């Protein structure tokens, strides 16, 4: 599933292609996604101008020149947004086609259909946005804040930093990498982390996310940026997906670990 850097990459790629463009038509080709597509609600976008594209956690928000409605998008497991010439042949899993006034169209493509593409009332937060935690790249997201969340919590630290109600946008890839670079076992109870360890972990999270955004996100099987190019941060990954290989720090063998039904990778020697 795309994590924060992938969604941020998508946002940055879409902005110059969509902002100030007018929507001339909306074609809903398959109504069944995570939540059914509402063709009538989406038709309200016709004749509207796209004014801005923002991100909250792993969600994209497409704002238009109406104050009452906006579009909320989640890419799910395999979703992508592409801006293509209107003459480009329509693909099987192009579920929504938004025609623009410049000869191009925005297409939502999602083979697994776990994504979300919905119109919502912009004057109040969508229910999926109401209880989200702090953005990890905000200045207010510090090691001290993380340490406060760890207090008296027996939950594994790997699960805590992926809890979207605490810190948003961090998935298994960046959690695995940040814990390795911080020397912290992913299965340690959060309450056992010191303030210094939390500071180190948060610093690594920020560094990893910033670097991944700069490089266009992590190459996942189903992720690509709006221009169709895959991200290439995977070349920089240290341990994620490398169980059974040698640790890049100490040379010992990296091991798998199952936490809350999610697989992670760590070095038993380097991570304590």
Curated annotation (Swiss-Prot):
GO BP, sorted A to Z: base-excision repair
GO molecular function: 8-oxo-7,8-dihydroguanine DNA N-glycosylase activity; class I DNA-(apurinic or apyrimidinic site) endonuclease activity; damaged DNA binding; zinc ion binding
Cofactor (UniProt): Zn(2+)
Gene3D superfamilies in the record: 1.10.8.50, MutM-like, N-terminal
UniProt keywords, alphabetically: DNA damage, DNA repair, DNA-binding, Glycosidase, Hydrolase, Lyase, Metal-binding, Multifunctional enzyme, Zinc, Zinc-finger
EC number of this enzyme: 3.2.2.23, 4.2.99.18
Cross-referenced Pfam families: Fapy_DNA_glyco, H2TH, zf-FPG_IleRS
Reaction(s) catalysed by this chain's protein: Hydrolysis of DNA containing ring-opened 7-methylguanine residues, releasing 2,6-diamino-4-hydroxy-5-(N-methyl)formamidopyrimidine; 2'-deoxyribonucleotide-(2'-deoxyribose 5'-phosphate)-2'-deoxyribonucleotide-DNA = a 3'-end 2'-deoxyribonucleotide-(2,3-dehydro-2,3-deoxyribose 5'-phosphate)-DNA + a 5'-end 5'-phospho-2'-deoxyribonucleoside-DNA + H(+)
UniProt zinc finger (FPG-type) residues: 238-272
Family annotation (CDD domains): EcFpg-like_N
Residues bound to DNA: 93, 112, 153
Active site annotation, chain numbering: 2 (schiff-base intermediate with dna), 3 (proton donor), 58 (proton donor), 262 (proton donor)
Lyase among keywords: yes
Cofactor remark: Binds 1 zinc ion per subunit.
Subunit structure, interactors included: Monomer.
Family classification: Belongs to the FPG family.
Function: Involved in base excision repair of DNA damaged by oxidation or by mutagenic agents. Acts as a DNA glycosylase that recognizes and removes damaged bases. Has a preference for oxidized purines, such as 7,8-dihydro-8-oxoguanine (8-oxoG). Has AP (apurinic/apyrimidinic) lyase activity and introduces nicks in the DNA strand. Cleaves the DNA backbone by beta-delta elimination to generate a single-strand break at the site of the removed base with both 3'- and 5'-phosphates.
Protein name: Formamidopyrimidine-DNA glycosylase
């Amino acid at each position: 599933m795309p994590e924060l850097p992938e969604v941020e990459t998508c946002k940055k790629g879409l902005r110059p292609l969509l902002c100030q463009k007018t929507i001339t038509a909306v074609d809903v080709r398959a109504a069944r996604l995570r939540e059914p597509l509402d063709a009538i609600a989406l038709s309200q976008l016709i004749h509207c101008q796209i004014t801005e594209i923002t991100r909250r956690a792993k969600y994209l928000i497409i704002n238009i020149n109406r104050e009452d409605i906006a579009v909320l998008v989640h890419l799910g497991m395999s979703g992508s947004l592409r801006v293509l010439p209107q003459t480009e042949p329509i693909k099987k899993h192009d579920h929504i086609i938004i025609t623009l006034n410049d000869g191009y169209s925005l297409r939502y493509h999602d083979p697994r259909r776990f994504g979300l593409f919905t119109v919502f009332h912009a004057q109040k937060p969508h229910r999926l946005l109401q209880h989200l935690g702090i953005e990890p790249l905000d200045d207010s997201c510090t090691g001290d804040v993380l340490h406060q969340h760890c207090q008296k919590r027996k939950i594994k630290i790997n699960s805590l930093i992926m809890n979207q109600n605490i810190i948003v946008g961090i998935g298994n890839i960046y959690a695995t990498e940040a814990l390795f670079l911080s020397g912290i076992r992913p299965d340690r109870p959060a309450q056992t982390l010191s303030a210094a360890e939390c500071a180190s972990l948060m610093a690594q999270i920020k560094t990893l996310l910033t670097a991944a955004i700069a490089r266009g996100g992590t190459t996942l099987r189903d992720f690509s940026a709006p221009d169709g190019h895959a991200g290439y941060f995977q070349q920089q990954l240290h341990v994620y997906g490398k169980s059974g290989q040698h640790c890049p720090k100490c040379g010992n063998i990296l091991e798998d670990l199952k936490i809350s039904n999610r697989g992670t990778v760590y070095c038993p020697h380097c991570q304590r």
